[in-house]
């Protein structure tokens, strides 16, 4: 069983590095002040501004009358480990050689009421079983797409591309892509469930509201075994606080799994360093042993 964790543990380290880099860029890096322009000489022609390499174009506050959500965004919390409040813990004792690398950071609940997920009794038993068997069954460990809302609070930053009408979100981990159907006034559904489901969006004032359905039941909400059925409906609300902060909320409604709808809430931070990018995370090679252990044997590839 220990060797089946190899792919997941490598991925945990990569995600931790990505989170640390994102925090450093967002919180520590400041732009250097620009020198004052020299006063023009009498009779001289007005100077023409020459774009410098790496210069950032002015960011419009609104696009087609709506707030500008364009940018690379990141949640800075431990929700991907566990949406509920959790103390510091670690992987099973057989991984003692990893030392503190195998520790899981503490975190507070991201539920809006600060409580716990309102599972039905049988669903709670399933959650506990999922937790005991982690990473088995976790789509993140298998390098599958994470689905909604997990991609939003995953440790790796994601990108929002907003046009006059259409909106797309790109998630580097497992090549996740999400097209938000802003033109669909009838809120159609997809004929087949999928990892990303179908996202229909609309504006409520300055809030971007996205309703996602048709999500596959095999997706997990975090690494703590929290889950949903294919009856889940996720209603997200993106509210731009200023040019670098989004207040994010997502309400999860799944009558097969939960006794009532419940809501998570957290801020998202825009990466402000010059030439910020969302780098592709090719995770498939790290999941080979976990997925195909029985076929390729116990010995990891060199």
Task: Write out the residue ranges for each language-model feature.
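PEST-like low-complexity, intrinsically disordered acidic/proline/serine-rich tracts
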Residues: 2-302
